[in-house]
Amino acid sequence: MRSFLISGILALGLMATGPIALAQDATTKYVRFSHDGRTGFGILDGTTITALDGDPITGAKPTGKTIALDSVELLPPSDAGKVFAVGMNFASHISSASDRPPPLFLKLPTSLTGTGSDVSLPPDANNVHFEGELVLIIGKRARNVSEADAMDYVFGLTAGNDLTERSWQGRDLQWMRAKATDGFGPVGPALVTGLDANNVLLTTRLNGEIVQQENTRNMIHKPAKVVSYLSRYFTLSPGDMIFMGTPGRTSALDDGDVVTVTIEGIGTLTNRIVR
């Protein structure tokens, strides 16, 4: 699957060179990866990763060491302690009222998997649907923040696929099994700063065919509203993720299907479904 991974990143390879700048005044791509048995962070420039001495969200600097992209396994781009999600956030999918609180649910850190990885379905998961989504990644502790200040607490963006078992979703009391099963939260390929969360194009493909495509400007509950609302009830910590909802129609996946989620400026998240 590594060929999917590399081509997806290069397709939209925006990168700011030079010293790392956590002020987010430029577009920069950060990746989290496994290499030679170790987990690290780096800045992606084309097919080269410049290794960092720590997590860019909490503070890091380049080490000067470079690593070839095709020699690493890309992991979820942050070490998320909490994974929130918004439902019914596009009228083209299922809409909710803009003057009401955003509908929320949780995924689990163990739901997360990186680009290029296979998603192995439980044997009784027979109605799993793709849901391509924009994902916010929190940059600093947030509690009771205003909507006006909320985006100051977002470090950057990535792409996600909120895989969902529709039969379980309709039958179970809670959505935990349907939404938070291991592997049901692919994210990546990179954590990107400097993008406008309210204006990026999201495209989902199933086996190369476009099945979802919409601009995030059409989100009903905007990122600032969601971050502010969540922070009333939950402490948001650096690295936490917020899935922002899916547009359009979804459909069930079969063994061997390849789902890609492309967001302009971020790149392409690619995963294969395996039974």
Q: Language-model features: where?
A:
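Positively charged n-region of N-terminal signal peptides that target proteins for export
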Residues: 1-4
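Bacterial N-terminal signal peptides
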Residues: 7-17
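N-terminal non-catalytic cap/leader segment that marks the start of a structured domain
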Residues: 8, 22-102, 125, 195-199, ...
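A generic local secondary-structure boundary/capping motif
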Residues: 73-75, 94, 119-128, 142-149, ...
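Structural signature of FAD isoalloxazine-binding scaffolds in flavoprotein oxidoreductases
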Residues: 101-115, 130, 260-264
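RNA pseudouridine synthases
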Residues: 135-138, 144-160
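Catalytic-pocket segment enriched in acidic/His residues
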Residues: 166-275
